[in-house]
């Protein structure tokens, strides 16, 4: 790793370069944000080849690889699943793992989530500005600046481009098996100063099978909510039908009173022969459900005041309201684990599904670093069994832990302190899941600064241009420190000659 004096000298040159390149850096990020890279169905290109995450994700990937080639970097496209932009020589590699895919935009934005561009006030706006296109582009411009000022890293610097981080993360695993692991590095996909621990992640579904009902009365025709399991849902919707449409007036009045009493907005409107009921919440990252307002919980709380012809539907709604509801710590399902290292478990319901066969929810748990996933499931099962609820395990990511005095953690902490002047900051444990779990020797480093508004997975995501430029500086310093400077053989000989005189 480079010494502090080397970091200071090269950082000064980089600072001047950033000042000259600020407009280009902002425009490149705005262009990347304009590509709506939400994962979609695979797109066939030719026999035996496809874009596994859809056209838009591939477009964002192609854009970054094009920028890399234009800057004179080596690039790699690993079967359209992941890739990298790289410069420098050396046997070892510093890896920076970032991702180009984004979660769905959702509703309620004050500006277009993909085409808002840069505001007159200097805000770079749109989905991905914080998570993770802004940090990714900041690392790219740090690399570009270092190359253009003549920095020669002793280790290769590799910006690894993930394409499905928000869903399975399988693309990165595919890439790492073929390209190999970097020796050390970081991912700019969390918050500052440094994340030395990440809670474990469980994704699973809870569902109840539905029997046919021959009764007549208020029928639940449709029920849905949420776009992704790792997002607090911002909206949810039900469609109900009655053989006596006059009953809709009573339902609408109940909805009005519910909203007035609870403070949760509900909207009702006639839709053909049915009545639509829509709940509005506040989206947030699924790892911090307490920062959002769950629209699924709002909708089911209201539907609990109605009685449907299918008693299994009524029982599911009662189960949800009593054992999940608005709680975000899993206490209703007897899984409110916590520890001194990482704090409390968090519980998010991200999606709601319904058809004539079953009704269910997709859930996301972030559990303490000293727990095991099976402990969580074992704790929940007695409650689930009592209500005839089925559980389907989807994904599990075990916790990540580095000691606070680990050399990598300490090096990145020092970079952060030098840049910000914050000598009181300490390494953190996060509920978020990052690529650091898949890549030993890496931790999350930024990109959200303490005190800044966290808009990740939320509407109106944006970053100030000044913060973005600061990210370029801080990541540039981190790359200088971690990669080290390759010594010119002639300089080494001069140093030996001086020592011998």
Ranges and model annotations:
Residues 2-127, 148-153:
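Acidic/His- and Gly-rich active-site-bordering loop/insert found
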Residues 30, 65, 137-144, 173, ...:
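Predominant activation on well-ordered alpha-helical scaffold segments within soluble catalytic domains
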Residues 87, 208-210, 240-244, 279-281, ...:
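Short beta-strand-to-loop capping motifs
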Residues 93-161, 167, 183, 458-459, ...:
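Active-site metal-coordination/substrate-binding segment of hydrolases
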Residues 103-119, 207-214, 269-279, 414:
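Acidic-glycine-rich active-site phosphate/pyrophosphate-binding loop
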Residues 132-211, 252, 256, 328-341:
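Acidic/histidine-rich catalytic neighborhood of metal-dependent amide-processing enzymes
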Residues 205, 211, 215-216, 231-243, ...:
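A short core secondary-structure module
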Residues 278-283, 287-356, 362, 366-378, ...:
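An extended, acidic, His-containing surface patch that forms the Zn2+-binding/catalytic region
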């Amino acid at each position: 790793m480079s010494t502090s004096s080397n970091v200071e000298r090269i950082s000064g040159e980089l600072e001047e370069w950033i000042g000259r390149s600020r407009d280009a850096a902002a425009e490149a990020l705005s262009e990347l944000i304009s590509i709506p890279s939400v994962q979609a169905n695979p797109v066939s290109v030719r026999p035996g080849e496809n874009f596994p995450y859809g056209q838009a994700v591939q477009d964002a990937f192609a854009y970054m690889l094009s920028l890399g080639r234009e800057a004179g970097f080596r690039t790699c496209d690993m079967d359209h699943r992941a890739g990298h932009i790289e410069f420098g020589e050396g046997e070892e590699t510093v890896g920076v793992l970032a991702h180009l895919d984004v979660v769905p935009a959702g509703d309620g934005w004050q500006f277009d989530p993909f085409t808002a561009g840069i505001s007159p006030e200097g805000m770079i706006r749109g989905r991905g500005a914080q998570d993770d296109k802004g940090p990714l582009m900041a690392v790219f411009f740090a690399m570009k600046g270092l190359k253009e000022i003549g920095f020669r890293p002793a280790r290769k610097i590799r910006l690894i481009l993930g394409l499905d981080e928000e869903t399975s993360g399988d693309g990165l695993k595919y890439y790492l098996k073929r390209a190999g692991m970097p020796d050390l590095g970081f991912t700019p996909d969390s918050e500052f100063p440094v994340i030395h621990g990440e809670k474990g992640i469980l994704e699973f579904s809870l569902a109840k099978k539905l029997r046919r009902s021959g009764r007549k009365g208020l029928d639940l025709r449709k029920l849905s909510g949420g776009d992704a399991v790792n997002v607090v849902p911002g909206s949810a919707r039900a469609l109900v039908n009655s053989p006596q449409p006059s009953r809709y007036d009573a339902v609408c009045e109940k909805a009005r009173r519910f909203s007035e009493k609870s403070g949760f907005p509900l909207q009702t409107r006639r839709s053909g022969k049915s009545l639509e009921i829509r709940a509005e919440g506040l989206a947030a990252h699924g790892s911090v459900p307490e920062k959002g307002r769950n629209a699924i919980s709002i909708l089911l709380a209201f539907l609990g005041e109605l009685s449907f012809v299918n008693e299994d539907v009524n029982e599911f709604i009662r189960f949800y309201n009593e054992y999940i509801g608005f709680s975000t710590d899993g206490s209703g399902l007897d899984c409110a684990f916590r520890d001194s290292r990482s704090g409390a478990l968090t519980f998010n319901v991200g999606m709601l599904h319904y058809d004539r066969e079953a009704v269910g929810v997709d859930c996301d748990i972030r559990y303490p670093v000293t727990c095991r996933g099976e402990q969580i499931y074992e704790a929940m099962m007695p409650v689930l069994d009592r209500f005839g609820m089925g559980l389907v395990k989807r994904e599990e990511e075990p916790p990540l832990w580095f000691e606070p005095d680990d050399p990598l953690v300490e090096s990145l902490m020092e970079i952060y302190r030098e840049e910000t002047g914050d000598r009181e900051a300490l390494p953190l444990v996060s509920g978020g899941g990052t690529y650091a779990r898949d890549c030993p020797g890496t931790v999350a480093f930024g990109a959200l600064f303490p005190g800044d508004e966290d808009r990740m997975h939320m509407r109106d995501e944006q970053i100030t241009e000044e913060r973005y430029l600061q990210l370029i500086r801080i990541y540039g310093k981190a790359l200088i420190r971690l990669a080290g400077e390759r010594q010119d053989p002639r300089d080494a000989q001069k140093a030996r000659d001086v020592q011998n005189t």
